[in-house]
Each structure stands twice: as structure tokens, then as C-alpha cells.
UniProtKB/Swiss-Prot annotation:
Name this polypeptide is given: WAT1-related protein At1g09380
Every EamA domain range: 19-149, 195-323
Residue ranges that the Swiss-Prot or TrEMBL entry lists as coiled coil: 325-354
Transmembrane regions: 6-26, 37-57, 70-90, 99-119, 139-159, 183-203, 215-235, 251-271, 279-299, 304-324
Amino acid sequence: MAKSDMLPFLAMVLVQIGYAGMNITSKMAMEAGMKPLILVAYRQIFATIATFPVAFFLERKTRPKITLRILVQVFFCSITGATGNQVLYFVGLQNSSPTIACALTNLLPAVTFLLAAIFRQETVGIKKASGQAKVIGTLVCVIGAMVLSFYHGHTIGIGESKIHWAYAENITKHGSSSGHSNFFLGPFLIMAAAVSWAAWFIIQTKMSETFAAPYTSTLLMCLMGSIQCGAIALISDHTISDWSLSSPLRFISALYAGVVASALAFCLMSWAMQRKGPLYVSVFSPLLLVVVAIFSWALLEEKLYTGTFMGSALVVIGLYGVLWGKDREVSEKEEEREKVKQQNHKVKSESNEDIESRLPVASSGNGSTRSTSP
């Protein structure tokens, strides 16, 4: 693998490992008693602090003017991409498991395709193989999500992990006895989070056409998200002790979610997309499911069910169907552009030959002929 291919590959693997760590640490913090809305508020605050120097030093000379229209678009980005997405996701994570949460997150490309088609940012092309793959892949993703949500089945006997530590074991036992989990509400909220996240893609794509400053827009989005999430968390829980970060687990999970899973992840994904495109970045999302499933089994003693395995497999298969269709569509468009380019070149050549054939011919002094300009 060439160096130009190796660096984006390593960056995206690092992002998925970072997201896996966020799911594990956040689940442990919530099992230990941290409220999900408070965790989301701290995540936005830490993400704002971490993103500020990146946006300031990298875009202070190239940043377009921030107009009222841009601020309105950023506000809707914060509602969908920060507040709505993360509040729904973390409450859903509290009421499910990290493995199910990550599996349902793979619905994002399919949901994004549906919304993009509705808002005419994506063409379906049902008569072409690319369009058929996107539609079928979306349907398979939805079926997989339904299996994950409503069918558990039998436990898969893969044995017990020998490396989990007592701290995580005590937390998960305490959490399981507290009755927080709701394996119907949790998946539903995570699917709603995927819809909110997909809506952010639609709004962000529109905004990037006039405001090409991704780090600054992320900074503003996180800042507005901090205010929104902070207000929601204060209304729902204004007990001072619940906001305390004196516990190392609470502080680490909030700091990790903000710095690694928000600020660092966005920078690495933006860098990879500039070099390889968004499709390349999307292909790595199923890796998160594999990493989290291993970590959850090893560290949190999470049991794997046949329904989880079957639903996850369907979601991943459907995801790659959508991505294959998108990649095929890009290839088809490039082929069409190349054909148009060749046709234009052919027409231009024939036109030049026709013009030359129509030029008058004049005799030179030595009896030969030459063309004269009109």
C-alpha cells in the first residue's frame, strides 16, 4: 500500500477506534450514574474548547464573512447535528447496548440517501444498476434495523472474557440491576438519532456551498450546541451533584467524547475526505461495530444474541449495497462526461475540417494553389 493510501487508512481506523472508546466509556459513565443529557452538554463544551484553536489557526485568513444567513444555517446544523443527534443517541445508548447502538448507526448512509433523494440532492436512477443497488441496500438496512430492535433470539455461546477488570464488572452489575435498559426504546431513539444526523448532512451540504470553512462551522455548531444541550440538561436536572466531574470516570468520558469523538474525529475525517472523498470515509463505519462488539464482550461482559448478529449482518450488507451503488453512480457519471467530451471533440474536429474545405483557393506565382483567409 502506497504512503498516500496508508495515511488516510490509518486515520480512519483511528477514528473508528476512537468512536468505539467513546461508546464504551460513555456507557460505563451512564451505568455509574451520570445522566446522558449532562454528558452530552459536557461533550459539546469540551468539543468547543478543542475546536477553537484549530479553526482559529487554520481558517483565520481564508474564512468567509459570517452573515446572518450563515448563523441561521449553523443554528439548524446545531439542532440536528449536535443537540438532536447526540441527545437521542446517548439516551438510546443508556437504554440499549454499545453493540446495538453502533449497529444501528450504520443506518446513516441509507437514511442520508433517502433524505437526499427527497430534497433532490441525490438522484435515484432506478433503471440503472447503481440506483437499484442504493434502493435495495436501503431496504436491507431497514430490515436489519428492525431485526436488531425487535428480535433477540438465543445467546451466542462464545465463552466469557478473561480480561475484564473488576471496576467495569461492578459498574455493569450495578447498571443491570437498576433497570435502566429498555431494549425497545433504546434502538428507536438511536434510529431517530440517525435521522437527525442525516438531516445535518443535508443542511451542512447546502451551507458549505456558500461557507467553505468546515472547522469554523463546526466551532459555531458546537458552541450553539453547548448552549442548547446545557439548557436542556439544566431544565431536566439542576442538582449540583449530578453535574460534578469529581469522579475520574465521568471526567474522562466527557473529555474523551468532546476532544476525541468530536474535535479530533471531525478533523481526521475532513482531512481524509479531501484526499479520498466521502465514500472512502463511509466505508469504515462497519469497523466500529466490530471493535465495539469485541470491547463490549471483553470489558463489559456483554452477551451477543442471534438477533444482534443477524441484524448487524443485514445492516452491514445493506450499507455496502448503498455504498457500491454510490460508487457505481460516480463511475457512470465520469463515463458520461468522458463520452460527452469525446463527442464535443469529434464535432469540433469535423467543424474545423468543414470550415477548411470551404475556404477559397488562390493560385500562387509558381502555379501551386494556397488557401486564403476570408
